Structure formats: C-alpha cells, structure tokens
Curated annotation (Swiss-Prot):
Family: Belongs to the thymidylate kinase family.
Tree of life domain: Bacteria
Record-linked InterPro entries: P-loop_NTPase, Thymidylate_kin-like_dom, Thymidylate_kin_CS, Thymidylate_kinase
UniProt KW keywords: ATP-binding, Kinase, Nucleotide biosynthesis, Nucleotide-binding, Transferase
Molecular-function annotations in GO: ATP binding; dTMP kinase activity
Organism of this sequence: Wolbachia pipientis subsp. Culex pipiens (strain wPip)
Biological process annotations from GO: dTDP biosynthetic process; dTTP biosynthetic process; dUDP biosynthetic process
Protein name: Thymidylate kinase
NCBIfam families: DTMP_kinase
PROSITE patterns in UniProt: THYMIDYLATE_KINASE
Keyword Transferase: yes
Purpose: Phosphorylation of dTMP to form dTDP in both de novo and salvage pathways of dTTP synthesis.
Residues involved in ATP binding: G7, I8, D9, G10, S11, G12, K13, T14
GO cellular component, one term: cytosol
Length: 205
C-alpha cells in the first residue's frame, strides 16, 4: 500500500506520517514499512533538496527538477518496496507539485500531469490532505523555506489547490479538516479510521 500526506506548510504532515509509519511497523514489523519524503527520498534527491527549497528558480525548471527527483524516488525506492509487499508512506508527493507549482506559481496543470504521465509516475493508493487555515499553518511551520517568503495569497492558492485536488480525486484523497482545533492524537485517530475503511482486517488501536 502506498500512502501520502499532503497540505500546506505547518499542517502536521510530517508528524502524522511518522505516527502512521510507527503504527504499521507495530503490525507488520520494522522492515516492512518505508517512511520517506519529498523532495528527497534518495541520495540524489537529498543532495539537491536544500538548494531546491532555498534558491529561486524558474517555475518550469523547478517542475522539471521535482519530476526528475520523483522519477528517481519511484524507481529506486518506492516501486521496489511495493513489489516486496511493503507499506510505503511519503511526506509529500505529486499533489504538492500540482498545488505549489500549478496553483501557486501558475504552471499549466495539464503540463504537470502530462509530464508525470510521460515518466509513468504511480499515484498513491490513499492520500491524506491535512487542511488548515493558512495563517495558523505558517505560524506552526518548523522548517523554513523560500515558499514561506511568498505572500499569504500564494498560500491561499495552494490551499485551494489541495481542496480542488481532493474533489477531483475523491476516491484517493481524504481531507482531514479542523486541524488547528485538534491535537495530534485526534487527527491520528481520524486517519486510522480512514485506513480501516480502506483496508479491512487491521488490528484495533
């Protein structure tokens, strides 16, 4: 099973991806769960992650870099793990590119999707979109990057992008709302409830 977490900065993706990974490890064993992230996930991608999140480059160049990193990530880590029957959990994936580069920076959405289709990027089985108020999210964000220097309007566009993705991809995407008013355990419980509905036979919390 391939599961991804999406949302604006400060929405709690990293925390929830770690909690879910630990849950699956308790069920299936430490070696049967892969927790990864984007940008990153491979030696190649991790080497340029810092520059990509700090340096200002053209949106199309940025898209091409993200896509090449994602292709490498899929080929070297995600697909081999899935073929071995492992559960893969990823902090950000294709939907972040659609939201940030597409809705936020104005790159044509069809170009993003066509490019990913060309290199045969696999879509996740389940995606959790953690929806949070923009200003609350930015105040909670721990990892500072170039995007946080953008205007509030930029982040509103990204949030809207994630919301529209969830509507268009409703079979795959699950939106967790009210993040700012819930503690991590409450959000985690809602995520586990969704997992149970998607995959029967999981042991109770």
């Amino acid at each position: 099973m391939f599961i991804t977490f999406e949302g604006i900065d400060g929405s709690g993706k990293t925390t929830q991806s770690e909690l879910l990974a630990n849950y699956f490890k308790q069920i299936h064993g430490e070696n049967n769960v892969v927790l990864t992230r984007e940008p990153g996930g491979t030696d190649f991608a991790e080497k340029i992650r810092g520059s990509l999140l700090k340096d200002n480059i053209d949106p199309i160049s940025e898209l091409l870099l993200f896509t090449s990193m994602r292709y490498e990530h899929m080929k070297e880590l995600i697909l081999p793990a899935l073929k071995e029957g492992k559960t893969v959990i990823c902090d950000r994936f294709i939907d972040s590119t659609i939201a940030y580069q597409g809705y936020g920076l104005g790159v044509d959405l069809s170009l993003i999707r066509d490019l990913h289709k060309l290199v045969e990027i696999k879509y996740p089985d389940i995606t959790f979109i953690l929806d949070i108020d923009v200003q609350v999210g930015l105040s909670r964000a721990k990892d500072k990057n170039k995007y946080e220097e953008m205007s509030i309007d930029f982040y509103h566009k990204i949030r809207k992008g994630f919301q529209e993705i969830a509507i268009k991809e409703s079979n795959r995407c699950n939106v967790i709302t009210g993040i700012a008013d819930k503690d991590n355990n409450k959000v985690y419980s809602e995520i586990i409830d969704v997992i149970r509905k998607k995959k029967k036979g999981m042991q109770p919390l």
